[in-house]
Amino acid sequence: MEDFVRQCFNPMIVELAEKTMKEYGENPKIETNKFAAICTHMEVCFMYSDFHFINERGESIIIEPGDSNALLKHRFEIIEGRDRNMAWTVVNSICNTTGVGKPRFLPDLYDYKEDRFIKIGVTRREVHIYYLEKANKIKSEETHIHIFSFTGEEMATKADYTLDEESRARIKTRLFTIRQEMASRGLWDSFRQSERGEETIEERFEIKGTMRRLADQSLPPNFSSFDNFRAYVDGFEPNGYIEGKLSQMSREVNARIEPFLKTTPRPLRLPCGPPCFQRSKFLLMDALKLSIEDPSHEGEGIPLYDAVRCMKTFFGWKEPIIVKPHEKGINSNYLLAWKQVLAEIQDFEDEKKIPRVKNMKKTSPLKWALGENMAPEKVDFEDCKDVSDLKQYDGDEPEFRSLASWIQNEFNKACELTDSSWLEIDEIGEDIAPLEHIASMRRNYFTAEVSHCRATEYIMKGVYINTALLNASCAAMDDFQLIPMISKCRTKEGRRKTNLYGFIIKGRSHLRNDTDVVNFVSMEFSLTDPRLELHKWEKYSILEIGDMVLRTAIGQVARPMFLYVRTNGTSKIKMKWGMEMRRCLLQSLQQIESMIEAESSVKEKDMTKEFFENKSETWPIGESPKGVEEGSIGKVCRTLLAKSVFNCLYASPQLEGFSAESRKLLLIVQALRDNLEPGTFDLGGLYESIEECLINDPWVLLNASWFNSFLTHALR
């Protein structure tokens, strides 16, 4: 093949092709088919340009060799064949003088008559497949594409072939001659089969060896090689393909692609019914902490010791009374369970006698609250398979609930700043590479914005509770263990602080599978009067257990202290994820980082410092009925963190389904906003799949409400 190339092509073209291949680290003596392809491509580019000039009236004319053309301007600027730096210099110069947009990839020619760059393609395959590959790669309407094949076919953008028929015929004849010459030497088959998509001199990542074999083995049916599959994917036109498939289907399938217009989407239908209720595993904005500053007592750090010290800071205990009963529960049992906790803690008269772990006596109220002996008896299937009316339990249909205002209030509160710092980030060594320095800077800025955020408190509280509960579930399977709900933070002055939110009593926990459930009773302190929002506390039995004296602007005020009690349950897999709630920090930091990267790529330098320190700039935070809400970069950080934390606290199948399905509609709306003229079919089916997830979950209902606000404002 190398000998053929040197005989068949002009020595100048051969020399340029050799230089080009060496520039990209390729050897013409080894990659002979590529050598031939580059020479062919260059010759076509030169033939395209030959004899074409522009006269003084700006008209394109053809002047044969030998005729005078000294005063005429060449119609085409040849870019192909120049070294890469020079080629880009020529392109930039043309863009500056003509105002034409700069192409993403090096073109082959510039047409001064039509004022456009041209990409020439020469293919040994079908022209339309190669044309689509080029178009998909270039993704620009400003660069004109013209493809020739060795069989005499051609294809060009909008069927505009630029040259007269005679000039194009000359190129096709030359290609046909090259093909015949190769065939007569037995070189054509090898040359034809060697084409792998792009054969021009652009860089290409080549897969070789084991990876190549794996790629060829890992293909859908009907594809013989990875290259065929890639060519198919590159040339894939989704809308046309879908319409084609629909036309082949049964006549019963009645699906037409409809244009998606501003007037097309409707709001999501939120369910009606009683207001939704609080279902998180622990109280959020309504939680009350009993705290000790600078703890230095004996056994400091042992949860039970810390809890006893925190309990001793409060002197307003009183005889508990039920102020809000649970409709279906035996509320007196919850009352007796709290009395039992108080009594067993008060038994530790001398602090030196406090045990490291406290197992509660298995009293009747606790057994009831923890569902002891309530599970139906398991019978071996072999013993009952002949029972004629054997059937599965009828599951109750979930009751539809409407959106309540408390969940928006919870979210707003989670975005707020507290007066304590909840994050202790470990030192991770000195930065060495510049990238590490940027990463540390971003982490430090982000940490400063979110360390005092209430959502961060929820993370640390969730990590502690889930870790303690999982440890107890594995270490004391048969015991009703008392687990204090504790968190640790630092005050504004930097003093350490230990907080007690309440207690958990764990039930029997023989957890074999990840989804096996352990029951627990949570008892949490609060100053929130439940009678203000009774619907929020449907699952709770609430006691008044004391009076707390608070300092206010008008002096000291006594407020009733409540205990929110409920039976709840969790599983190993839920506790495992709860222990990893710190991931929420990482997720929201990555979202912020993508915003910084977008800004940095526009400014062509790292914008981290400017991003966080420009306090005057506001950023979109989310949608509300009023429109797009904006705030400082700190508010954006805290809002993104709160969303991530709530996704964790309110994780459910409803949230999974809503997120996956609503994303599809969101992408369609975004495509419409980007003027991409999206088309849809069975939009009603998509709405159905979104709305079947809107049942009773407060966080999902709030997200659906936000989605409706987005639809309203996005399509104005």
Swiss-Prot record:
UniProt keyword Manganese present: yes
PTM statement from Swiss-Prot or TrEMBL: Phosphorylated on serines and threonines by host kinases, including human casein kinase II.
Record key words, sorted: Cap snatching, Endonuclease, Eukaryotic host gene expression shutoff by virus, Eukaryotic host transcription shutoff by virus, Host cytoplasm, Host gene expression shutoff by virus, Host nucleus, Host-virus interaction, Hydrolase, Inhibition of host RNA polymerase II by virus, Manganese, Metal-binding, Nuclease, Phosphoprotein
Gene Ontology terms: biological process: cap snatching; DNA-templated transcription; symbiont-mediated suppression of host gene expression; symbiont-mediated suppression of host mRNA transcription via inhibition of RNA polymerase II activity; viral RNA genome replication; viral translational frameshifting
Chief location of this protein within or outside the cell: host cell
Free-text comment on the cofactor: Binds 2 manganese ions per subunit.
Keyword Protein transport appears in the UniProt entry: no
UniProt EC number: 3.1.-.-
A single cellular component GO annotation: host cell cytoplasm
Gene3D superfamilies attached to this UniProt entry: Influenza RNA-dependent RNA polymerase subunit PA, endonuclease domain
Motif (Nuclear localization signal 1 (NLS1)): 124-139
Pfam family for this entry, one: Flu_PA
Residues involved in Mn(2+) 2 binding: E80, D108
Cofactor names: Mn(2+)
Location(s), subcellular: Host cytoplasm; Host nucleus
Enzyme class: hydrolase
InterPro entries named in the record: INFV_PA, PA/PA-X, PA/PA-X_sf
Residues where Mn(2+) 1 binds: H41, D108, I120
Family: Belongs to the influenza viruses PA family.
Assembly and interaction partners: Influenza RNA polymerase is composed of three subunits: PB1, PB2 and PA. Interacts (via C-terminus) with PB1 (via N-terminus).
Function: Plays an essential role in viral RNA transcription and replication by forming the heterotrimeric polymerase complex together with PB1 and PB2 subunits. The complex transcribes viral mRNAs by using a unique mechanism called cap-snatching. It consists in the hijacking and cleavage of host capped pre-mRNAs. These short capped RNAs are then used as primers for viral mRNAs. The PB2 subunit is responsible for the binding of the 5' cap of cellular pre-mRNAs which are subsequently cleaved after 10-13 nucleotides by the PA subunit that carries the endonuclease activity.
Name of the protein: Polymerase acidic protein
Organism name: Influenza A virus (strain A/Swine/Tennessee/26/1977 H1N1)
Lineage: Viruses, Riboviria, Orthornavirae, Negarnaviricota, Polyploviricotina
